[in-house]
Regions:
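Active-site neighborhoods and metal-handling regions in enzymes and metal-associated proteins
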Residues: 1-524
């Protein structure tokens, strides 16, 4: 048992509660939290980007979605941790409730849970007479020194809108304000980025906007935020319950007013023409970086996953990337069955017949994240590799070319239905088909998935998103093919022009329509 488990259980006893929810996120509710700031990682040893843990005096449950089923099993100590593998459509709150006794008390950190999640916990667990208690402290957290941010302003020719124009679109009335705590929204509104961060370029802070003024709290001034928000005299402060923490919402008290549709979310996800043009240039550079890496795999022997990752990121810099938009995935053979594998080991040597899955992206001068996935083969593939690759390619082509959709879940259904019917034995598609892209590599809306609120948002022109079907089988391999796309005149267009691997395509499995669709993409 590690020291953090002991700390969690000591907290249960001291506070006289039965359960503690330990989060993967931080005070800004980010998706990709640094491991050094990730309490759930300290508690469980699991390094995935999402997934929370439930602690009781006798058990610890780790809840993970399909991307992390295999990885969680590999990383946790099963003597201490029980991995709960969520399936598509499972609701994590329902799974939490199943593992809690009636008439018990759950403690959560108010600074690491949104108001929306807090209220849903109260509602769901209330059905079992479970009380949810808020705490301002996280007993697992390891405090890290704060580094002053070095901020870069993105020029108008790359954003298409000034900060003032974006704030005016908030349409606030006299003595009204809006609180923005989502880092991507903050970066978008201010046209600022912090390129010194690893795998992200969002600025860190919180801001309040009024009709004619804005108040930004960051670095040293962030400590003044609680006092400001508690004592502000605005009649109304609008908040997005999905992104405001329960702590900040409580501080606002009666001044807080939930908005049904966040105006920043709406304007951020519909890209300007300048942003689209920047994206086209950024993806052309990303394509080149990945294509040269594929050539490196083909032309060199006795290279490792680590060597390929080094070459990949060198190529990104060569073509103008300021940094990576997430931790690059370079996964050979059975490692590619882990959707978010990120070890890139020096010990994993590429051999004849090896598959290499690369999922990567970068940031360029415009501060928008690129994202692409391709699979390469060293030498000649076997029949199963070709069959799985071609099946995934067919799913991509069908989803990319569909015109029968209103929202993201409609496109997801096209690929999912096909893969459910045609996947080779044991191979599964266990994640959403795609996600929005923008300041962050994962932006919402849109989302191409099933049943989430953002997958039901109508798709509009200039929305940008990925299409990334995949098939995975533990101890065998995984195939994922990902293009980042945008909507134009209600048709899906691809930013990505990176070729597909001809050696891995079984053309006998393609019908004439699929061959015609494929002809619009480079195959070599």
């Amino acid at each position: 048992m590690n020291n953090y488990i002991e700390k969690a259980r000591a907290f249960l006893e001291h506070e006289k509660i039965d359960y503690l929810l330990v989060n993967s996120t931080n005070e800004f509710l980010v998706e990709y939290n640094e491991l050094a700031k990730n309490s759930r990682y300290y508690l469980t040893g699991f390094s995935g980007s999402t997934g929370d843990a439930l602690v009781s005096k006798d058990n610890i449950y780790l809840f993970v979605d399909g991307r992390y089923h295999v990885q969680a099993d590999l990383e946790v100590n099963h003597d201490d941790i029980t991995v709960v593998k969520l399936q598509m459509g499972d609701k994590v709150l329902d799974e939490l409730a199943k593992r809690m006794n009636e008439h018990s008390i759950l403690g959560i950190c108010s600074k690491k849970n949104s108001q929306y999640r807090y209220e849903n916990l109260v509602k769901t667990l209330g059905l079992r007479n479970i009380t949810v208690k808020l705490f301002d402290t996280d007993p697992i957290e390891e405090k890290q020194p704060q580094k002053a941010q070095i901020l870069t302003e993105i020029p108008l020719n790359l954003t298409g809108k000034t900060k003032e124009e974006k704030i005016k679109e908030l349409d606030l009335k006299s003595n009204e304000a809006i609180l923005i705590t989502n880092l991507e929204e903050l970066s978008y509104l201010y046209n600022l980025r912090n390129f010194n961060k690893t795998n992200s370029c969002s600025i860190e802070g919180k801001a309040v906007f009024t009709q004619d003024k804005d108040y930004l709290f960051k670095d040293e001034t962030l400590k003044d935020f609680d006092s400001f928000i508690k004592n502000c005299t605005f009649d109304t402060v609008y908040v997005d319950e999905m992104t405001v923490t329960a702590h900040d919402y409580t501080l606002l008290g009666s001044k807080a007013s939930k908005i049904k549709w966040n105006p920043v979310t709406n304007s951020k996800c519909i890209k300007t023409e300048a942003e689209l043009e920047h994206y086209k240039d950024a993806f052309a550079r990303t394509d080149k970086a990945l294509a040269e890496t594929g050539k490196f795999i083909e032309e060199n022997d006795n290279i490792s996953e680590f060597d390929i990752k080094e070459e990949l990121e060198k190529n990104f810099r060569k073509y103008g990337a300021i940094g990576q938009s997430f931790t690059s995935i370079v996964a050979k053979d059975k490692n590619s069955a882990l959707a978010h594998y990120s070890k890139s080991s020096k010990e994993e040597i590429i051999k004849d017949g090896s598959l290499v899955l690369i999922d990567c992206g970068g940031y360029y001068a415009g501060g928008l994240a690129t994202d692409i996935t391709r699979v390469f083969v060293k030498g000649e593939p076997d029949k199963l590799q070709k069959t799985v690759y071609t099946t995934v390619l067919k799913a991509f082509l069908r989803a990319f070319n569909t015109t029968e959709f209103e929202c993201g879940q409609d496109i997801d259904k096209v690929a999912r239905d096909f893969l459910d019917e045609n996947a080779p034995s044991g191979f599964v598609f266990n994640h959403g088909l795609g996600h929005g892209i923008g300041v962050s590599v994962h932006e919402a809306p849109p989302r191409l998935s099933n049943g989430t609120w953002d997958s039901k948002v109508p798709l509009q022109d200039n929305m940008c998103f990925t299409i990334e079907p995949g098939l995975y089988k533990q101890d065998f391999f995984g195939i994922r093919l990902e293009n980042s796309c945008y909507l134009q005149d209600k048709k899906i267009k691809s930013f990505v022009n990176m070729h597909y691997e001809k050696k891995l395509i079984d053309f006998s499995l393609l019908d004439e329509q699929e061959k015609e669709w494929l002809s619009h993409f480079e195959v070599k």
